[in-house]
Protein backbone atom coordinates (compact mmCIF):
# COMPACT_ATOMS: atom_id res chain seq x y z
CA UNK A 1 0.00 0.00 0.00
CA UNK A 2 1.44 3.37 -0.96
CA UNK A 3 1.70 5.82 1.90
CA UNK A 4 -0.21 8.45 -0.06
CA UNK A 5 -3.26 6.15 -0.31
CA UNK A 6 -3.70 5.62 3.43
CA UNK A 7 -6.96 7.23 4.67
CA UNK A 8 -6.52 9.20 7.89
CA UNK A 9 -9.12 10.45 10.38
CA UNK A 10 -8.60 12.83 13.31
CA UNK A 11 -10.77 13.00 16.41
CA UNK A 12 -11.02 13.31 20.16
CA UNK A 13 -13.08 11.86 23.02
CA UNK A 14 -15.24 9.64 20.83
CA UNK A 15 -12.15 7.76 19.69
CA UNK A 16 -10.85 7.09 23.22
CA UNK A 17 -12.09 3.53 23.66
CA UNK A 18 -10.91 2.48 20.20
CA UNK A 19 -7.39 3.84 20.56
CA UNK A 20 -7.04 2.49 24.12
CA UNK A 21 -8.02 -1.00 22.95
CA UNK A 22 -5.67 -0.74 19.97
CA UNK A 23 -2.76 0.41 22.14
CA UNK A 24 -3.41 -2.48 24.49
CA UNK A 25 -2.69 -4.83 21.59
CA UNK A 26 0.09 -2.80 19.95
CA UNK A 27 2.14 -2.40 23.13
CA UNK A 28 1.55 -5.89 24.54
CA UNK A 29 5.27 -6.71 24.49
CA UNK A 30 6.67 -3.18 24.77
CA UNK A 31 9.55 -3.28 27.29
CA UNK A 32 8.95 0.24 28.63
CA UNK A 33 5.27 -0.47 29.36
CA UNK A 34 6.22 -3.82 30.92
CA UNK A 35 8.66 -1.99 33.18
CA UNK A 36 6.05 0.56 34.21
CA UNK A 37 3.73 -2.31 35.18
CA UNK A 38 6.47 -4.40 36.74
CA UNK A 39 4.40 -5.31 39.81
CA UNK A 40 1.94 -7.24 37.60
CA UNK A 41 2.29 -10.73 36.21
CA UNK A 42 2.30 -10.98 32.41
CA UNK A 43 -1.29 -12.23 32.42
CA UNK A 44 -2.45 -9.40 34.67
CA UNK A 45 -0.58 -6.82 32.63
CA UNK A 46 -2.03 -7.93 29.29
CA UNK A 47 -5.56 -7.94 30.71
CA UNK A 48 -5.08 -4.52 32.25
CA UNK A 49 -3.43 -2.66 29.35
CA UNK A 50 -6.68 -1.23 27.86
CA UNK A 51 -7.60 0.27 31.25
CA UNK A 52 -4.09 1.63 31.69
CA UNK A 53 -4.17 3.26 28.26
CA UNK A 54 -7.68 4.62 28.80
CA UNK A 55 -6.54 6.58 31.85
CA UNK A 56 -3.39 7.88 30.18
CA UNK A 57 -5.10 8.90 26.94
CA UNK A 58 -7.96 10.51 28.85
CA UNK A 59 -5.36 12.67 30.53
CA UNK A 60 -3.85 13.48 27.14
CA UNK A 61 -7.30 14.48 25.86
CA UNK A 62 -7.70 16.84 28.81
CA UNK A 63 -4.50 18.42 27.50
CA UNK A 64 -6.18 18.88 24.08
CA UNK A 65 -4.64 15.80 22.43
CA UNK A 66 -5.68 14.75 18.94
CA UNK A 67 -6.27 11.08 18.18
CA UNK A 68 -5.45 10.01 14.63
CA UNK A 69 -6.35 6.66 13.09
CA UNK A 70 -5.34 5.29 9.71
CA UNK A 71 -7.03 2.82 7.38
CA UNK A 72 -9.88 1.81 9.70
CA UNK A 73 -7.79 1.51 12.88
CA UNK A 74 -4.87 -0.43 11.47
CA UNK A 75 -2.68 2.19 13.16
CA UNK A 76 -3.25 5.16 15.43
CA UNK A 77 -1.52 7.94 17.30
CA UNK A 78 -2.14 10.33 20.17
CA UNK A 79 -0.49 13.72 19.72
CA UNK A 80 -0.47 16.49 22.32
CA UNK A 81 -0.28 20.01 20.85
CA UNK A 82 2.00 22.80 22.09
CA UNK A 83 1.16 23.86 25.64
CA UNK A 84 -0.36 20.54 26.72
CA UNK A 85 1.60 18.20 28.97
CA UNK A 86 0.75 14.63 29.92
CA UNK A 87 2.47 15.09 33.28
CA UNK A 88 -0.02 17.74 34.37
CA UNK A 89 -0.96 16.53 37.86
CA UNK A 90 -4.49 17.93 37.89
CA UNK A 91 -5.52 16.32 34.63
CA UNK A 92 -4.00 13.01 35.71
CA UNK A 93 -6.13 13.11 38.85
CA UNK A 94 -9.19 14.12 36.85
CA UNK A 95 -8.63 11.28 34.40
CA UNK A 96 -8.69 8.75 37.23
CA UNK A 97 -5.04 7.83 37.05
CA UNK A 98 -4.92 7.36 40.83
CA UNK A 99 -7.29 4.47 40.26
CA UNK A 100 -4.78 2.99 37.84
CA UNK A 101 -2.01 3.35 40.41
CA UNK A 102 -4.22 1.70 43.05
CA UNK A 103 -4.98 -1.24 40.75
CA UNK A 104 -1.30 -1.64 39.86
CA UNK A 105 -0.43 -1.74 43.54
CA UNK A 106 -3.10 -4.32 44.36
CA UNK A 107 -1.80 -6.59 41.59
CA UNK A 108 1.07 -7.58 43.85
CA UNK A 109 -1.26 -8.94 46.57
CA UNK A 110 -2.02 -12.66 46.50
CA UNK A 111 -5.57 -14.00 46.60
CA UNK A 112 -6.74 -14.39 50.18
CA UNK A 113 -4.07 -12.07 51.51
CA UNK A 114 -5.24 -9.13 53.59
CA UNK A 115 -4.03 -5.96 51.86
CA UNK A 116 -2.62 -3.59 54.44
CA UNK A 117 -2.47 0.13 53.90
CA UNK A 118 1.32 0.12 54.10
CA UNK A 119 1.63 -2.57 51.42
CA UNK A 120 -0.74 -0.75 49.07
CA UNK A 121 1.11 2.48 49.69
CA UNK A 122 4.46 0.85 48.99
CA UNK A 123 3.37 -0.80 45.75
CA UNK A 124 1.63 2.33 44.50
CA UNK A 125 4.66 4.45 45.35
CA UNK A 126 6.83 2.20 43.18
CA UNK A 127 4.84 2.98 40.03
CA UNK A 128 4.80 6.67 40.95
CA UNK A 129 8.58 6.53 41.26
CA UNK A 130 8.95 4.85 37.88
CA UNK A 131 6.62 7.30 36.14
CA UNK A 132 7.52 10.63 37.68
CA UNK A 133 10.96 10.43 39.23
CA UNK A 134 12.59 8.03 36.79
CA UNK A 135 10.80 8.32 33.43
CA UNK A 136 9.77 11.98 33.63
CA UNK A 137 13.03 13.05 35.25
CA UNK A 138 15.16 11.46 32.55
CA UNK A 139 13.00 12.56 29.63
CA UNK A 140 12.72 16.11 30.95
CA UNK A 141 16.51 16.31 31.07
CA UNK A 142 16.69 15.06 27.47
CA UNK A 143 14.16 17.70 26.42
CA UNK A 144 16.24 20.45 27.97
CA UNK A 145 19.20 19.29 25.91
CA UNK A 146 17.36 18.44 22.72
CA UNK A 147 14.81 21.22 22.31
CA UNK A 148 17.42 23.99 22.40
CA UNK A 149 15.33 26.17 24.67
CA UNK A 150 12.09 25.78 22.71
CA UNK A 151 9.08 25.65 25.03
CA UNK A 152 6.46 25.00 22.36
CA UNK A 153 6.45 21.65 20.57
CA UNK A 154 4.20 18.81 19.49
CA UNK A 155 4.49 15.64 21.57
CA UNK A 156 3.78 12.19 20.12
CA UNK A 157 2.38 10.40 23.15
CA UNK A 158 1.83 7.14 21.27
CA UNK A 159 2.00 5.82 17.71
CA UNK A 160 1.72 2.23 16.62
CA UNK A 161 0.36 -0.30 14.14
CA UNK A 162 -1.47 -3.59 14.60
CA UNK A 163 1.04 -6.44 14.48
CA UNK A 164 -0.31 -7.94 11.24
CA UNK A 165 -0.22 -4.61 9.38
CA UNK A 166 3.30 -3.50 10.19
CA UNK A 167 5.74 -2.71 7.41
CA UNK A 168 3.06 -1.28 5.10
CA UNK A 169 3.76 2.41 5.69
CA UNK A 170 0.61 3.06 7.73
CA UNK A 171 2.28 4.55 10.82
CA UNK A 172 4.59 6.43 8.48
CA UNK A 173 1.56 8.06 6.86
CA UNK A 174 0.34 9.23 10.26
CA UNK A 175 3.73 10.63 11.16
CA UNK A 176 4.02 12.43 7.84
CA UNK A 177 0.64 14.03 8.54
CA UNK A 178 1.94 15.20 11.94
CA UNK A 179 5.10 16.55 10.34
CA UNK A 180 3.03 18.61 7.94
CA UNK A 181 1.07 20.03 10.89
CA UNK A 182 4.27 20.89 12.76
CA UNK A 183 5.83 22.37 9.63
CA UNK A 184 2.84 24.69 9.16
CA UNK A 185 3.25 25.88 12.77
CA UNK A 186 7.06 26.02 12.45
CA UNK A 187 7.43 23.93 15.62
CA UNK A 188 9.40 20.77 16.47
CA UNK A 189 8.00 17.33 17.31
CA UNK A 190 9.23 15.45 20.37
CA UNK A 191 8.83 11.75 21.12
CA UNK A 192 10.40 8.80 22.88
CA UNK A 193 10.85 5.66 20.77
CA UNK A 194 10.49 2.51 22.86
CA UNK A 195 11.70 -0.13 20.38
CA UNK A 196 14.54 -0.44 17.88
CA UNK A 197 11.96 -0.69 15.11
CA UNK A 198 10.21 2.56 15.96
CA UNK A 199 13.56 4.27 16.44
CA UNK A 200 14.60 3.22 12.93
CA UNK A 201 11.31 4.48 11.47
CA UNK A 202 11.67 7.91 13.06
CA UNK A 203 15.31 8.22 12.01
CA UNK A 204 14.23 7.48 8.43
CA UNK A 205 11.75 10.34 8.64
CA UNK A 206 14.23 12.99 9.66
CA UNK A 207 14.15 12.70 13.45
CA UNK A 208 17.34 13.35 15.38
CA UNK A 209 18.27 11.04 18.26
CA UNK A 210 19.06 13.08 21.36
CA UNK A 211 19.75 10.42 23.97
CA UNK A 212 19.33 6.74 24.74
CA UNK A 213 17.67 6.50 28.15
CA UNK A 214 17.79 3.34 30.26
CA UNK A 215 15.05 2.71 32.80
CA UNK A 216 15.51 0.23 35.62
CA UNK A 217 19.26 -0.05 35.10
CA UNK A 218 20.70 -2.58 37.53
CA UNK A 219 17.24 -4.02 38.23
CA UNK A 220 15.80 -5.40 35.01
CA UNK A 221 16.86 -6.99 31.72
CA UNK A 222 16.31 -5.38 28.31
CA UNK A 223 12.86 -7.02 28.12
CA UNK A 224 11.90 -5.66 31.59
CA UNK A 225 12.17 -9.03 33.34
CA UNK A 226 13.78 -8.87 36.77
CA UNK A 227 17.56 -9.20 36.60
CA UNK A 228 19.96 -8.03 39.27
CA UNK A 229 22.62 -5.93 37.58
CA UNK A 230 20.63 -5.93 34.33
CA UNK A 231 21.08 -3.28 31.62
CA UNK A 232 17.57 -1.88 31.97
CA UNK A 233 15.08 -1.11 29.21
CA UNK A 234 15.96 1.42 26.52
CA UNK A 235 14.03 4.27 25.02
CA UNK A 236 15.32 6.92 22.65
CA UNK A 237 14.52 10.61 23.05
CA UNK A 238 14.11 12.11 19.58
CA UNK A 239 13.21 15.43 17.97
CA UNK A 240 12.19 16.54 14.50
CA UNK A 241 12.77 20.09 13.31
CA UNK A 242 10.57 21.80 10.73
CA UNK A 243 13.54 23.50 9.08
CA UNK A 244 14.47 20.06 7.71
CA UNK A 245 11.36 20.04 5.55
CA UNK A 246 9.93 19.81 2.99
CA UNK A 247 12.83 17.87 1.47
CA UNK A 248 13.42 15.78 4.60
CA UNK A 249 9.88 14.42 4.69
CA UNK A 250 9.94 11.04 2.89
Please identify what each model-predicted range represents:
Residues 153-154, 181-194:
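Conserved GNAT acetyl-CoA-binding A-motif
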Residues 76-160, 216-231, 244-249:
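Conserved acyl-donor/pantetheine-binding loop and adjacent beta-alpha core of acyl/acetyltransferases
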Residues 172, 184-186, 195-219:
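Conserved active-site alpha-helix within GNAT-family acetyltransferase domains
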Residues 161, 167-180, 204:
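Conserved acetyl-CoA-binding loop-helix of GNAT-fold acetyltransferases
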Residues 44-68, 74-75, 129-133, 151-152:
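A short helix-loop-beta-strand connector motif used in the catalytic cores of GNAT acetyltransferases and
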Residues 1-7, 13-14, 243-250:
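Eukaryotic N-terminal low-complexity, Ser/Thr- and Lys/Arg-rich leader segments
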Residues 232-238:
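Short hydrophobic/aromatic beta-strand or adjacent loop that forms the aromatic wall/cage
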Residues 4-25, 29, 33:
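A short beta-loop-alpha structural element at the N-terminal edge
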